[in-house]
């Protein structure tokens, strides 16, 4: 008698379906829900459906695990062979918007909360272009999954666990650590024989497939979908895809984004900033040309009107040419252009041109001095303003904080 048909419902087959029928339906549904075939805004939902189909097939394709599922279902108590695996009730709820507990669809049946495994975080460097346009990141990962033969118990069918001999059934061991010549600390560590359960199977009762560990390594290609509004340190989560263990709810695999430095743009929030390099002639007379290539590959043409003179350090704002504010609308931040004027090199302007420029450009007013003021003629040398105040003679000294030897005071008699 079949006590639970949820996995069959996911694969859209009858619980008496043959192995060939199950395989055929799995291939059809896997192709239908494959994330690569979904639009970018539906990829996460498709990935959830695809994972649910995959997990259901992983159990039903194996005759032994299918038999155990038919006998005990997914949520029985002491006899459950699937406890600690992927939570298919959550998968069903995400796929169909229903609560599939032991009482059936729509029933609010409380469920014992299981311990949760650790998350796995992968740091990923991404270009500013990919953060602007969005990207699918594929990551090949290896994780521990519940053994398909023993469903994570680590022992043969109907074999009983016994107190772990390594930790005396406590699940932890005492660990002595020398922290100094005459000092030792005592701490507890999880038993590596029973993985903290306190019980284990004897040698003859252990599952031969996983050698009693309850898990086997599995390689999977995970897909993470970076939205076009992604920011530094954003986390993209594949829930429940970390290591599995018996009696444990798997943690998440997390992709944490780190933006690579960009040669042209600097980002702050939804805004971008770039240097606008122009010649002195352009600063004085205006220009009309492509000034840079945008993150989506467009050439950005800018018109500076004649008569509008630009100065070093001026800021020009181009509205709506920054980053996307979110993944659902076309609202964008602004592009800030910082004017950087390139002056001509020494000797480029001849004597005749110099006289013409002096006639055209306004002159600087002279500093007025008294007739009897002593005038010194000086010349400068090229320098670096960052060296200002850096005279080695005054290094590590605070101006105005000098101390002097004083005259000893006479003590009162």
Curated annotation (Swiss-Prot):
Cited SMART domains: DnaJ (SM00271)
CXXCXGXG motif repeats: 147-154, 164-171, 191-198, 207-214
CDD domains assigned to the protein according to its UniProt record, in alphabetical order: DnaJ, DnaJ_C, DnaJ_zf
The J domain, residue ranges: 6-73
Pfam families: DnaJ (PF00226), DnaJ_C (PF01556), DnaJ_CXXCXGXG (PF00684)
Prosegment location in residue numbers: 411-413
A biological process term (GO) from this entry: protein refolding
Superkingdom of the source species: Eukaryota
Protein name: DnaJ protein homolog xdj1
Record organism: Schizosaccharomyces pombe (strain 972 / ATCC 24843)
Gene of this entry: xdj1
């Amino acid at each position: 008698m079949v006590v639970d048909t949820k996995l069959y419902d996911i694969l859209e087959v009858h619980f008496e379906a043959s192995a060939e029928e199950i395989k055929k339906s799995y291939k059809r549904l896997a192709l239908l829900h494959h994330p690569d075939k979904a639009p970018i805004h539906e990829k996460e939902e498709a990935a959830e459906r695809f994972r649910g189909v995959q997990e259901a097939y992983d159990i039903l394709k194996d005759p032994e695990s299918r038999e155990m599922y038919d006998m005990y279902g997914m949520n029985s108590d002491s006899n459950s062979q699937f406890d600690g695996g992927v939570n298919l009730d959550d998968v069903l709820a995400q796929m169909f918007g229903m609560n599939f507990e032991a009482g059936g669809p729509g029933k609010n049946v409380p469920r014992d909360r299981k311990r949760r495994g650790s998350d796995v975080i992968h740091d990923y460097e991404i270009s500013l272009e990919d953060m602007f346009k969005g990207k699918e990141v594929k990551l090949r990962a290896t994780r521990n999954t519940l053994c398909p033969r023993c469903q994570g118990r680590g022992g043969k069918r109907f074999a009983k666990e016994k107190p772990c001999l390594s930790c005396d059934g406590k699940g932890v061991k005492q660990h002595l650590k020398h922290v100094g010549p005459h000092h030792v600390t005592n701490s507890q560590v999880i038993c590596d024989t029973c993985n903290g359960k306190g019980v284990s199977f004897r040698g003859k009762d252990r599952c031969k497939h996983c050698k009693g560990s309850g898990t086997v390594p599995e390689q999977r290609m995970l897909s993470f979908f970076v939205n076009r509004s992604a920011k530094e340190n954003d986390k993209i989560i594949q829930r429940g895809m970390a290591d599995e263990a018996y009696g444990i709810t798997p943690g998440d695999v997390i992709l944490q984004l780190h933006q690579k430095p960009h040669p042209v743009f600097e980002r702050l929030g939804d805004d971008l900033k770039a240097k606008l390099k122009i010649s002195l002639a352009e600063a004085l007379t205006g220009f009309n040309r492509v000034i840079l290539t945008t993150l989506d590959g467009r050439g950005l043409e800018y018109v500076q009107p004649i008569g509008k003179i630009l100065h070093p350090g001026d800021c020009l704002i181009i509205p709506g040419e920054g980053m996307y504010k979110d993944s659902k609308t076309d609202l964008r931040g602004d592009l800030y252009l910082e004017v950087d004027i390139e002056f001509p090199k020494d000797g480029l302007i001849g004597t005749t041109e110099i006289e013409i420029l002096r006639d055209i450009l306004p002159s600087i007013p002279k500093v007025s001095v008294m007739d009897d003021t002593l005038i010194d003629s000086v010349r400068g040398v090229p320098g670096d303003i960052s060296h200002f105040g850096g005279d080695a003679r005054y290094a590590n000294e605070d101006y105005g904080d000098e101390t002097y030897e004083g005259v000893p005071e006479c003590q009162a008699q």
